[in-house]
Swiss-Prot record:
Free-text domain note: Contains one proline-rich sequence (Pro-Glu-Ser-Pro-Arg) that may be involved in tyrosine-protein kinase YES1 binding and is required for the activation of substrate transport.
Note: Mediates the renal secretion of many clinically used cationic drugs. Transports drugs such as diabetes treatment medicine metformin and neurotoxins 1-methyl-4-phenylpyridinium (MPP(+)), famotidine, ranitidine, amantadine, acriflavine, amiloride, memantine, cimetidine, cisplatin, oxaliplatin, platinum-based drugs cisplatin and oxaliplatin, 3'-azido-3'-deoxythymidine (AZT) and tetraethylammonium (TEA). Mediates the bidirectional transport of MPP(+). Metformin competitively inhibits OCT1-mediated thiamine uptake, leading to a decrease in hepatic steatosis.
Reaction(s) the record says it catalyses: (R)-noradrenaline(out) = (R)-noradrenaline(in); (R)-adrenaline(out) = (R)-adrenaline(in); serotonin(out) = serotonin(in); dopamine(out) = dopamine(in)
Glycosylation sites: 71
InterPro entries, A to Z: MFS_dom, MFS_sugar_transport-like, MFS_trans_sf, Orgcat_transp/SVOP, Sugar_transporter_CS
Known tissue expression: Expressed in kidney and ureter. To a lower extent, also expressed in brain and embryo.
Pfam family for this entry, one: Sugar_tr
Gene Ontology biological-process annotations: acetylcholine transport; cellular detoxification; dopamine transport; dopamine uptake; epinephrine transport; export across plasma membrane; histamine transport; histamine uptake
Protein name: Solute carrier family 22 member 2
Membrane topology note: Multi-pass membrane protein
Length: 553
């Protein structure tokens, strides 16, 4: 009996219907960007210092410039105005309203040396050096409360983790289209509610809800488009779907620049989700899923609709459907299957580490850029541009060179770029940006490679389980990354880059221990997967020479 792939060969593997559907789902992919990396703009932390009652009035009376006001009233500023923990989180215990204070050096009358003046934590809020607003400036997520910004982003990734597993199961149980529309609706409503949140706690709840459904919706969109196209187009369409995410990065930078208020920015990036609800009339259910649920009549109706859209017709001989998988006895996948045999166990551990590393470096580099960059909008835009050549490199090398070497090199390039950035002087900003973009391109290639190779190393009956379990480390990485970046920068601004360099270089080395999958059929059994080892040419040649030598003697 024919499969969906057999029918698509006759009615079009990537014709008008698939192109229209891809365009619609690509919009969904781009709209996921603000949730995944929006913390750069929503959680932007500008320079700040304690608000002290009476300072503004004294500054106005004395006619100080902003720089003079900071120099006279803020502790811990360096000679060039460098910020520190003291300047941002501590204040002089001085009554600035007293009339005896001098305009030239107001603290000289209180102590011969400023370092002898008592300090105390900020009690009256902060003054932020920015014309816009972020969740940091509105809810004062600085100093003793800075961990609350880490929690904000980590909770999104907790939602990613739970939603990808739970909603992924529901999509297999109740259908792709239904779950896609539900995730879009919840994402849209919770996004609007977050924009009007009265306090930090409610904002946290609604952001978690967005995380719970948004990544799951992105994954369902990925599954849908790959199930609508023919076998020969799946990999290319999958890469292009991720390129749409990159386009979303570029658009996000422009929207964030135009809307420096975080609430308006949140509204702007959320409202398009309501338009995606129109997909109810534009995108049908996956015929492959319908067949797997023994709903062949509905599947054939959709297939005929696709054929009509493509200007084709379904041959009568192909109108009896069967699932792509064998309908005989099926093995039940088990988590133990991922670690029971030596080669698969090695694959599982290396892939889990690489998923974790890809997430930490990808999100971490973006977050660090928001802290260290001079212009976060331009830096974000430039670093997003390098994801286009990253996708081109993958398409160019994956079937020519293979998976293993480009993947290993990309990890090592990302790690080396992070390490090099530590030693580049601040006055060579152009070089810092160039090296940062190189690192971003490297980790982008690694991220997309691990998505592909993960499915190619496991036998059929545990393939989905293996991808699910290994990729869950991606969300674990996303949970720890905010704490890693924001806390380590409190110690030293470049400290996170050193950590990124180490984990990236280790990941590249571990990839070389995996077998090459280029040109190899997908393993069907445990035995097939266990035999996917690199050819040991040198050892075989040595044995051959020893045999010939023995024959001659």
């Amino acid at each position: 009996m024919p499969t969906v792939d057999d029918i698509l060969e006759h009615i079009g593997e990537f014709h008008l219907f698939q192109k229209q559907t891809f365009f619609l789902l690509a919009l969904l992919s781009g709209a996921f960007t603000p949730i995944y990396v929006g913390i750069v703009f929503l959680g932007f932390t500008p320079n700040h210092h304690c608000r002290s009652p009476g300072v503004a009035e004294l500054s106005q009376r004395c006619g100080w410039s902003p720089a003079e006001e900071l120099n006279y009233t803020v502790p811990g500023l360096g000679s060039a105005g460098e910020v520190s923990f003291l300047s941002q989180c501590m204040r002089y215990e001085v009554d600035w309203n007293q009339s005896t204070l001098d305009c030239v050096d107001p603290l000289s009358s209180l102590a011969a040396n400023r370092s002898h003046l008592p300090l105390s934590p900020c009690e009256h809020g902060w003054v932020y050096d920015t014309p816009g607003s972020s969740i940091v400036t509105e809810f004062n997520l600085v100093c003793a409360h800075s961990w609350m910004l880490d929690l904000f982003q980590s909770l999104v990734n907790v939602g990613f983790f739970i939603g990808a597993v739970g909603i992924g199961y529901l999509a297999d149980r109740f259908g792709r289209k239904f779950c896609l529309l539900v995730t879009i609706l919840i994402n849209a409503i919770s996004g609007v509610l977050m924009a009007i949140s009265p306090n930090y706690a409610w904002m946290l709840v609604f952001r978690f809800l967005q995380g719970l459904v948004s990544k799951a919706g992105w994954l369902i969109g990925y599954i849908l488009i790959t199930e609508f196209v023919g076998l020969g187009y799946r990999r290319t369409v999958g890469i292009c779907y991720q390129i749409a995410f990159t386009v979303g990065l570029l658009i996000l930078a422009g929207v964030a620049y135009a809307l420096p208020n975080w609430r308006w920015l949140q509204f702007a990036v959320t409202l398009p989700n309501f338009c995606f609800l129109l997909y109810f009339w534009c995108i049908p259910e996956s015929p492959r899923w319908l067949i797997s649920q023994n709903k062949n009549a509905k599947a054939m109706k959709i297939i005929k609709h696709i054929a009509k859209k493509n200007g084709k017709s379904v041959p009568v001989s192909l109108q009896s459907l069967t699932a792509d998988e064998d309908t005989g006895m099926k093995l039940n996948p088990s988590f133990l299957d991922l670690v029971r045999t030596p080669q698969i166990r090695k694959h599982t551990l290396i892939l889990m580490y690489n998923w974790f590393t890809s997430s930490v470096l990808y999100q971490g580099l973006i977050m660090h850029m928001g802290l260290a960059g001079d212009n976060i909008y331009l830096d974000f835009f430039y670093s997003a541009l390098v994801e286009f050549p990253a996708a081109f490199i993958i398409i160019l090398t994956i079937d020519r060179i293979g998976r293993r070497y480009p993947w290993a090199v990309s990890n090592m390039v990302a790690g080396a770029a992070c390490l090099a950035s530590v030693f580049i002087p601040d006055d060579l900003q152009w070089l810092k940006i160039t090296v940062a973009c190189l690192g971003r391109m490297g980790i982008t290639i690694a991220y997309e490679m691990v998505c592909l190779v993960n499915a190619e190393l496991y036998p059929t009956y545990i393939r989905n389980l293996a991808v699910l379990v290994c990729s869950s480390m991606c969300d674990i990485g996303g949970i720890v990354t905010p704490f890693l970046v924001y806390r380590l920068t409190d110690i030293w601004l470049e400290f996170p880059l050193v950590v990124f360099a180490v984990v990236g270089l280790v990941a590249g080395g571990l990839v070389l221990l995996l077998p090459e999958t280029k040109g190899k059929a997908l393993p069907e059994t445990i035995e097939d997967a266990e035999k996917m080892q690199r050819p040991r040419k040198k050892k075989e040649k040595r044995i051959y020479l020893q045999v010939k030598k023995a024959e001659l003697s």
